[in-house]
Amino acid sequence: MKINNSKIEILIASLILVLITLGIVLMYSPIYFHANDDGIISGLANGQYTGKVSIELIYGSKIYGSLLAVLYFILPMFQWHGIILLSIVLFSSIILFLEISKIEKFTFLYRIGIYIIVINSYLIFVISPTFTKTALISGLTGTLLIYKNLITQNHKVIIPGFLLFMSAIIRPDGFAAVLYFAFPALLYTLYIHLKNIKTLVRYMVSFFPSVFVFIQETYLNDIFGRLPDEWKKYWQFLNAFHQIHTNPSMTKMHQEIAAFQIPGLEWTNVEATLLTTVTYFDPIIFNPSQMELAKNHVNDFIGIRGLLNSEFILTLNRIWEYMVQINYLFYVLLGIILFLLLVIKKFGQVFLLLAFTLYVFFLYYYLGAVWRIPVRINMPIIFMMIISLLILISYLKIRSIKNVWLISIISSVFVILFQFQPKGFIGIQENLIKKQGEQEAISNELKRVNENGIFIGHIKYGYENYTNAYVTRNNHRSLDLTSGWHVFSPPWNQKAKSLGISDANPTFVFTNKKDVYFVGDDYMGQVMGMFL
């Protein structure tokens, strides 16, 4: 009877996810990707820029690019990038439902609370899909299964291995965060099962494919020269840009640029502003040697040197600036950790919880000190830690199980309240409706200026991509490009050259081509005016 009840729970919860998907897609279409990166990925894969499908993706692996290329070639009307992301998150959520249904130690109310949290996490993803969230949700679900298997000594590795692999191929650099969370489990596996070769091999099989893809895409492609020359140059530029643009020291760098304190750097504060806002790249001004100088300058603020140079209180404030955007979720996570510290019986388990909490804090401190923690990274990590801890509680020795259901229900209430905040479902839905109106206005403006006009640069209405996440058809004229760092990508350069533009440079196009124009917001308009 218990098995039947579990199956019914999974069936009902899964049906709710399907209904949520259909309801949101029908009610709010067109749904846009959460970030412009996904719009660019789909544009590269489906041939929007070059007229033919491509396996070369920005931020994605060749394996994922090959899969997308085949699907776009067979059925080009579907936005396969978004559909695959949605399918993986749906599968991950159903796997989480399966794990929740196995919790027999506590009451049904306890399971209800976790079901609600998973459903709310899925709800946000459907209306704002992105490959970063997918990689984290899939990878951290696989990581949860590995930790649970180690606790229960039930060594099933196929599904965890699949989830980790999908995380790695969709976003190799995003998989680094997943690998960070999985690393203690990997060390523990090596320590405990070193003499049990059969079990050790099973776990290595689950880890190896994803880790191999991560290493290959992050390091080996460049070492063994498997990338075409134009893509090598692009990745060299992109990596330099990322270290500069996403670094917390960029404000300080601006001050030093304005004071001419960086030897050899020929930028003024205007060029630095254009670089920081990801709006305009002049291949002459932002040439490889200048980018390298800027990158070397910020090297003192990244990696180990960045941690050593960071100011503790300033970094904590920076972390809180990111965390306050999802503060209700953060409060839930803290509440669960405090609850566990109070109810766990075994000192060893308390010690492990404290050690893992410090381990996670170190990751956030590193990101706050030398990088950044945007919501699309922070939210899925916090959600998955909440869900994972609530599932793993049932496998721990605790003092009393009488009122444990309260922590699950209270957590679910706070998660529901979060949905009414700007970064929750209601806020995202309002922003989506606003963006739909913006796209119509952009389309009308493009038609008014020139039916065949091409927009390059930031639009005054917003900074993200207006690309439909689930179908390729668009009733409005959409933007070819919304982020400057893609200007140097080989497919975009190929498209620009086909239009008679020699260097794909927005400013040269702006001044010399009447059918291509630049629209900026008030601040960027002033900066562009200073430059021109």
What is the role of each PLM region?
Residues 202-210, 387, 396-423:
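Signature aromatic-anchored transmembrane alpha helix within multi-pass, membrane-resident enzymes
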Residues 19-57, 69-72:
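Extracytoplasmic loop-helix module adjacent to an early transmembrane segment
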Residues 108-114, 147-166, 197-205, 401-408:
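Short hydrophobic alpha-helices at membrane interfaces in multi-pass membrane enzymes
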Residues 157-174, 178, 183, 206-216:
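Membrane-interface alpha helices of multi-pass inner-membrane proteins
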